Swiss-Prot record:
Biological processes, Gene Ontology terms: translation
Keywords, in A-Z order: Chloroplast, Plastid, Ribonucleoprotein, Ribosomal protein, RNA-binding, rRNA-binding
Family (UniProt): Belongs to the universal ribosomal protein uS11 family.
Gene3D superfamilies, per the entry: Ribosomal protein S11
A GO-annotated cellular component: ribonucleoprotein complex
Subcellular localization, as worded in the UniProt entry: Plastid, Chloroplast
Keyword RNA-binding in annotation: yes
SUPFAM superfamilies in alphabetical order: Translational machinery components
An example molecular function term from Gene Ontology annotations: structural constituent of ribosome
Organism per entry: Amborella trichopoda
Main localization (coarse): plastid
Full protein name: Small ribosomal subunit protein uS11c
Renumbered residue ranges of the record's region Disordered: 1-23
Alphabetical list of Pfam families matching this protein: Ribosomal_S11
Length: 138
């Protein structure tokens, strides 16, 4: 029986080089997605490849505590700690969503020692798109 020739870089034989190896990242983009239920902080390089991420849920907060400002602050601190060790000095911040953790995450990012180029609010706003859900009657 003929042996199959392994394709280089195929999904079956794994990735050739790990994306999360210790490369030096001088500049990056920090994405903060703050919903009412959770806060997700993702750190990418300039090309958009994910270097590090953390959410309030992965930090150990469960239930309604995930949406608190303290949980967002902890998630931002954990996500940035790894990239500061990899040498990130400058970053751009993109904040999305209406959650309570927006300001707390930004405060934690400012305290981390990374110089911020700019802070941009990228919350999606409809130009009167879909009909919103009906009002809650409690």
């Amino acid at each position: 029986m003929k042996k199959p020739i392994p394709r280089i870089g195929s999904r079956r034989n794994g990735r050739i080089g790990s994306r999360k190896n210790g490369r030096r990242i001088p500049k990056g983009v920090i994405h903060v997605q703050a919903s009412f239920n959770n806060t997700i902080v993702t750190v990418t390089d300039v090309r958009g490849r994910v270097v590090s991420w953390c959410s309030a849920g992965t930090c150990g907060f469960r239930g309604t505590r995930r949406g608190t400002p303290f949980a967002a602050q902890t998630a931002a601190t954990n996500a940035i700690r790894t990239v500061v060790d990899q040498g990130m000095q400058r970053a751009e911040v993109m904040i999305k969503g209406p959650g309570l953790g927006r300001d707390a995450a930004l405060r934690a990012i400012r305290r981390s020692g990374v110089l911020l180029s700019f802070v941009r609010d990228v919350t999606p706003m409809p130009h009167n798109g879909c009909r919103p859900p009906k009002k809650r009657r409690v």
